[in-house]
Amino acid sequence: MGVIESQLEPALNDAEFRMFTELLRRHCGLHYGPESRFVLEKRLSRRLRELEIKSFAAYHYLLRNARPGGVEFANLIDELTTNETYFLRERSQLRALVSEIFTELRLQRKTRARGPISVWSAGCSSGEEPYSIVMLALEAGLDPKQDLRVYASDISRKMLRKARQGEYRESSFRETERELRAKY
C-alpha cells in the first residue's frame, strides 16, 4: 500500500473505538483497552479494505446487524486474534504440570484413588499447547486415554481447523528437543 492510499484510510474516532470495543466484548469476549487502539484500528482497517467498506461506522453497522456466529464475525476474529504459539511454550507452567499434577496422578493411579483429570487448553490456537500436554503426559509415564482428558478450544475457527490437521512448520518446534520431536 502506498503513502497516498494509507492517508486515505479512515481514522477510528473515540466514539467508534468505544462502539467496537463494546461490540467485541459483548459478542466475542475480546477486550481492548486504550493501549490497544492502534492495533485494533489497523486490524479493522484490513477488514474495511477487504470488504471495500468506506468507514468504520458502516462496518460497525454491518457487524451490529450480522449474526454473532456468522462469517464476518469469524473473519474479524481471525484478523484480531494473535496466533503465536509453539510446542512446549511456557516451560515454567509445563514443569509445574509435570512435577505437581502428573507426579501425583501417577501415584494415585497405583491406588486407583481417582479417575482421569481434565486439562483445558483455552485459547489453544493451532494446537501446539494441547499436543505438548499429551507428549509430556506420555513422558511422565501416564496413559492419556486413561489418566487424562485434554480439551482444547479457541475463538478462531481457522486456528481450530489447523489444530485438527496437526501439521506444523519448523517454527512450531523451535523449543522442542530433538529426541521428543523424533519420538512424537
Region annotations inferred by a language model:
Residues G2-W120:
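Conserved AdoMet
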Residues S99, T103, M135-E139, Q165:
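Short, well-ordered alpha-helices that flank and scaffold nucleotide-derived cofactor binding pockets
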Residues R95, Y131, R161:
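Alpha-helical elements of the RecA-like P-loop NTPase motor core of helicases
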Residues S6-Q7, D14, A140, V150, ...:
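Intrinsic, short, N-terminal disordered tails of RNA polymerase sigma-factor systems
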Residues W120-S126:
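Aromatic-flanked redox-active Cys/Sec active sites in thiol-based oxidoreductases
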Residues S126-D143:
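Conserved SAM-binding loop of SAM-dependent methyltransferases across substrates and taxa
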Residues A122, D143-Y184:
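Extended basic-aromatic, gly/pro-enriched interface segments that bind polyanionic ligands
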